[in-house]
Structures are given as structure tokens and as C-alpha cells.
Amino acid sequence: QHEPSRREAAVRHAASAPAAFRRFQVGSADALAGDLAALQAALGDFHRTHYVARRMQLWLQGPQSLEALGELAARFAAGLAAGEAPPPAPPLRLGEFTALQLAVSSQPALWRCPLIALSDNVTLLREFLLDEAPGSLMAGLRQRRLAGDVALNWLYQDRHLGWLALVFASDRPEEVDRQITHWLQALQQTTPEQQLHYYQLSRRRFQALSPLDQLRQRAFGFAPGAPPAGFADFCAALQAAPSVSLACQTVSPGESVATQGFSLPLSRWRRRPESDPALGFAFYPQAAGDLVAKCPEKAAPLLHLPSPGEPPRLLLRPPFYCSPDQAEGLARGEQLRPQLAALRHAGGHGEWHLFDGSWQLTLQLPEPGRRPEAILQAILRQLALPVASLTPPPESIAIRHLIAQLPERLGTSGHQKGWLAALAGGSAEDAQWIARQLSLITAPVNPPMPAPAPCRRGVERLVYPGGDTALLVFIPLPDGASLAALRLLA
């Protein structure tokens, strides 16, 4: 069964009303008693009742005017039966037991799910929650090894009420739960300037999405609304709101609870007393003086590709065919997370990612006049520090596993230390400033490249943890004649 659905079902089991929260969700053909005609009739009745104009919402987003979008909506709705309006949603009530424990075999987590009045402040809360810069909740939890990742989702919404789910990947739920409370208290002390800063970050996050993802956020997620208002009161209400806590822990399963078509090893969560000190929270923006650092005198060689009007974008990557493996690359990304998030607060953007089989760091620097020397220097110093490899998540598709291994298997030259650096956009002055920052890297920058060696040949067999098998054939085409010959063979 789908593990995220099992966990969501465990949370919904804590709702005593309406009864729909515990109704049948999944099952096998045997559970339907084999009566296919009755199933088809029930599905038809459901469709005729609910797939009608008065019970549906249509969301449109596009470059057209509101009038044009309205005409498109009217044209779509013309083919729908009007139907009956839905009855008012019954109030959501939680049951007697709201602290639950679910036995799991892997991926322990904490779900903290408060019932709150709908508010635009939820999107602002999400921006604070997803922040990874030094002083944030997630940076502190990772530093103490209390949690790995976080997500915020809606479990339910009606016209006035919302049921949120704050989901933390953690095997220490008591400590994380306590720090969430401390964090909500700290958020109540944020200033209007700080709240506006995070609101603007939420708008940047939204604008970076594709049009389809923007539409999804408007309909089901956390699209930015009005500027912050009453955020401290919202956080206080959130802290005091009725909520469900679910600790997903790797413990021996006890008796199972049948709910929503699942059989869940669900029990009461008996919290252990914890007295860990609160994390030291800090919120942004930083004072301008905190971004200034002494500029090195020496300069490293830097390839500059001018592009008039474009902001400076720095690309750093290991020499060709010398990229770290996936385990080391993932660990480097974890190491860089706080400083890349700090760069985002300063008006820039950074990403450590895999591109065509090689790990690379892309830094979009802020507008001219806003040079975060301290942040950039901290990022560059991180590149010289060793990292402990992380176990990469298993690839569920065999051919993707082979494709991911291909660049490393094709490499023939020995490992070469150093970094390749290039700057796209920006002015000559920007290039000079960045070249001086790059001199902080202890390894060679843009070292001479050895002559490329021919690609490996032959057949190589790789062990795949799954049960599938796959064959990948790679044929390098060094010139146009080879490509033409291959096309003739095809």
C-alpha cells in the first residue's frame, strides 16, 4: 500500500466528525463482493451528483484578460448540468485521542496537524518554515540532527477552516515537537520589516514556478495573498489550536486498527519528557554590515562571458570527468544548504545540482550595489571542506540507474583537483570582484586541462538492487560521418 496514504489515513482517524474522514478509501476487488454492476451504478450516481456546475470549481490562469478568461470559463461550464448546491460542510471535530503513534518500517517522521481559521498568513508561515538559512528552524534541527526535511500540506479545507500538516522527517519526534513550539513563540516576536521580507520571498518562490504549478498553488496550495497583517496573533492562535500529532516510528507493531480500508498498527503516542534548550532563532533581513567581508587582493583566473543587461551568474564545477559520485554530491548539497539560503535572503539565488552527469554550483548574484561578500566567501570556503558521503535514495527504474552511472563509467582520466569557473553576464567590474573572491578556494581554479582520453569500450555489468534488468548501449559519434552512418543503419 502507498505509504504516504497510510500516514495520512492515520491522521484522519483522529477526526470524530464528520464521518467521511473515516470512510472507505482503498481496497481490493474482493471487498466489493464481486458485484461489478452495483459498482458501476454507484460510480454513475456519484458522478451525476457531484460532477455538476454547482459542486465544481474551475481555475484558469493565462495571459488573457479577466474578461477573456471569464468567456472561456462560461464556455466550459455550458456543457455541465447545474445540479444541486452542496450542503454546508459539517464542522470538523477531533476525537478523544489526538496523539497517535504509527509503527513504520522506514522513514520515521513527525506529523503536527493543527486546525486553524483560513488566512493568507499561512503562506507567510510556510516561507518561514521552508527557510534553511542560519538561524532558521530547519537549519537548527539539522545542526542537532533532529530532522532532515520538512513539508507543509493541506489535509482539508472548507470555507472557513483548514487542517494543516507540518511533516518533519525525524526519528526524534518529541524533541522536534518541542522546538516547533519554541519556534512559533519566536515568530510572534518578528518585526513588520521581517514579515514583509519573507512575504516578498514567498512571491519570488511563486513567480519562479511554471504556469501549471502556479495554478496548482492557487487551487490547492499556498499562493501569496495580501501582505502580512496580524501575523503574531495568527502564530499565537496556531500554537493554541486543537491539533493531531502523529509519530511515525520504527517500533514493533502492536494491534492493528481498521480504518478507511487500511489496517494500521496505530496506538496512542506516549511522549517522553524532553528538556532540550530552545534553538537560537534568527530572522532576516540581515543588517548591511553583516554581509561585508574583507576582499582578497589576489585574483583567480575566471572566464567571463559578457551579456549586456544580464545579472552576473557564476558557474562552478569540478574538471571534466572528475565529478564526485552521487553519494558525495548529495552530501555537498546538504553542506551548502544554509549558505545558499542566506544568499537568497540577500537577493540572489544558488543551486548545487546534477547536470548532464556532473555536479555543479550555480550562483545568481544580487543586483549591482548589493554584493554579499561574507555569504559568497562562506560558500567558497565550504567547497574546500571534506564531506561525509550520504546514501543516495534507491532508483526504482533500472534503465534510469544505468543512465545515472554512465558519465562516471565513461571517464578515463585520473582524478584532477580543482574547479572550473565561468561568469555569465555582469560587468567587467563584477568579474574582477568575483575573481578575487575565487582566490579563497584552496584548490586550483581553471587549471590546464589534460588531453582528452578515448572513451572506454566493452561491456560493463552493474549490480542493480531491484529485480529488473536493463541494457544501455552508448555509441559516441565524434564526427558528422559517424552520425550519417548510424542514420543509414537505423
Explain the meaning of each model-derived region.
Residues 130-170, 337-355, 472-477, 490:
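A structural supersecondary motif
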Residues 118-129, 308-352, 377-379, 473, ...:
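Active/ligand-binding-proximal structured segments within catalytic/core domains
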Residues 48-54, 156-162, 308-311, 352-358, ...:
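Short, flexible turn/loop "capping" segments at secondary-structure junctions
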Residues 32-33, 57-60, 126, 165-171, ...:
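Second-shell loop/turn segments in exported
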Residues 21, 52, 57-112, 260-287, ...:
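An aromatic/glycine/proline-enriched structural segment found at the starts
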Residues 1-46, 137, 148-152, 178-224, ...:
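Acidic/histidine-enriched segments that form metal/cofactor-coordinating
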Residues 238-325, 329-337:
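Segments forming glycine/polar-rich beta-alpha architectures that bind adenosine-containing cofactors
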Residues 66-71, 172-178, 254-258, 324-327, ...:
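Short, conserved charged micro-motifs
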